[in-house]
Amino acid sequence: MTKIMEMSSSELIQSIQSGKLKICVIGIGRIGLPTALSFANSGLPTVGVDINSELVTSINSGMFPLKDEPGYGTIFENMIKEKKFTATTKIEEAVPQCDVILLSLPTPMDQNNVPNYSALKSVGKQLHDLLTSGSLVIVESTIEPGFVENELISIIEGDRSRLHAGNNFGIGVCPETANPGQILNDFERLPRLVGAIDDKIANIITKIYKHVFTVDLIPMPDCKTANAVKLTTNVFRDINIAFVNELAMLFEKLGIDIMKVLEAAKTKYNFQVHYPGAGVGGPCLPVNSYQMLNLAKSANSNLLKIVEVSRRVNESMPEHVVSLLKEGFEESGKKLEKIGRAHV
């Protein structure tokens, strides 16, 4: 393997273009697997690591698990056939053999809506023992601003007797920006943010991602700013959806069609339209809003009350939609049976 942190710019480019750079993606789920396939498809040998042994066995048997992701089925078949991508549960074998370690791990909420970074912290502890000097770590997971600088680096470094960030290993972020069901399309059109602990590492990450993706790469001054941008874009949507949801409920009482209002309003050039509904389009936005609220709390701030209120509004919408359906069914003499709920 190469020592990516010690390469000159020309040596790095040659290593990338010749396919000598080895990639390890830790966490090959909904986003991690397409990410790994994109790197492999660019000519960089890639290994995916996951604790789900059934998933790993299925992948290595040639079975693509993400049937609802257009375009990646064919890429998967080709990468498996050409042996450019493999999967394993053995992180201890994969990490020491790779130059770049991508972290695409889940960051869910606990029962109190507090971000749970246990997966990232656990992998960080393993990297402390497994990471080879000269390697590069890139966090793609959506995390709170400051997590890399304040927690993850110290976990990987330990007592600094072997590893020292910015000295003999690099670390940065490139938050994923893709929606399930259209990941390949999003990877090909949505700009990516690049942040790192110093400019040299940011430039290395940019060169690697330019080889894999054709989108614009936007340089950020550091990791926390890049992560702040990712959260801000999603929390912005959550807040605006809450606003139109409350408008919709008000207009119901006044006999005004919210859709006609929005269609006319969006003819104004600076109006960014959002639509009411039972949810906000999946699990990511709620998680990101709670991450932002946790960030404010950790800063001993009472700010962002608007985010907290917006979450309450949007979380109440499924019941409101059910009540509207119930009214409609009762008026028509029919019954409505509520069986369960899922994120929408």
Language-model regions: role of each:
Residues 2-341:
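Structural/interface elements that position substrates and couple domains in central-metabolism enzymes
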